[in-house]
Amino acid sequence: MDQNINNVPAIEQVSINKIFGIPAGAQEILIAGRTAPAPYTPAIDPYYKFEMGHLRDVIAWLKVGMGEGLFLTGPTGAGKSSLVLQVAARLNLEVFNVTAHERLEFSDLVGQFVVKNGNMEYQYGPLALAMKRGGVFLLDEIDALPPGTNVGLNGAAEGRVLVIPENGGEVIKPHPEFRFAATGNTRGSGDDTGRYSGTIKQNLAFLDRFWCLEVGYLSKQKEEAILESVLPVPEMKGLIPKFLEVAEEVRRLFQSSDFTTQINTTISTRSLIRWVRLTHVFLSMAKRGCQPVYYALDRAILNKAAPEEKAAVKEIVQRIFGISEPEK
């Protein structure tokens, strides 16, 4: 990571009305941002569609200031990280993104000494850089965070100074625009469904430092608009409602509390786009006895699933599309 904090473009007040296309006539709202990307600004996904309620909440969180973390919870593939990344991308804010795991230590986030050109040099980690540069620290899969590490993050979530004893007692005073966001599938309360192995019940005092925003899958209307933008070809237009219906049914079973019908496979917006794109790519194979919808489905989603999961999803596809998979 670039350790230079002198190359950070200045943060100024920008209008969210213009950036996010809020209709004319609405009260103009200004928020901290930039007019051009900075080194760690995420790329804009031109096909991304915001749910206005989620966008409103993230904007409100950014405006509130330091000392209030944002915890986004929801099912796998709902777009929790993407929501933060795409808001930041349009505001040209920097994001320092880390995925938690059971071996993650506080020093991995703050920094450590490394050998550079034969000398020992202190290398700042993503948390320290976010605090110095006024970026968003985004900690994904917080449910997997070891208890000792989340205790170390209490101060950062509240916007307190960070002391680094290993670097001569350096004190980092957080930039006024530093923000701390986290994502997780289990609300930090542990997993009793068996879907999210490796998750750990999080410290209640740590979670108390965060707003909680529940993020579900995009609405069918939003996903339809995305698919039509990604693949605006006549031969696919009539099939898009069926792809969406399959995704909706698979997600319903994934989130079901009925263990007799529940499945452990879901379809994210990302994988839905992949499935539709691959189906279009493989359309020409239909003349050779290959069914492109099933062929693409395996490669986009189901080759990662257990055999019984594949069978369950393909039954849904057969019912909705009205086509059978050719025997192999």
PLM regions and their residue ranges:
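C-terminal regulatory/interaction module of P-loop NTP-utilizing enzymes
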Residues: 1-328
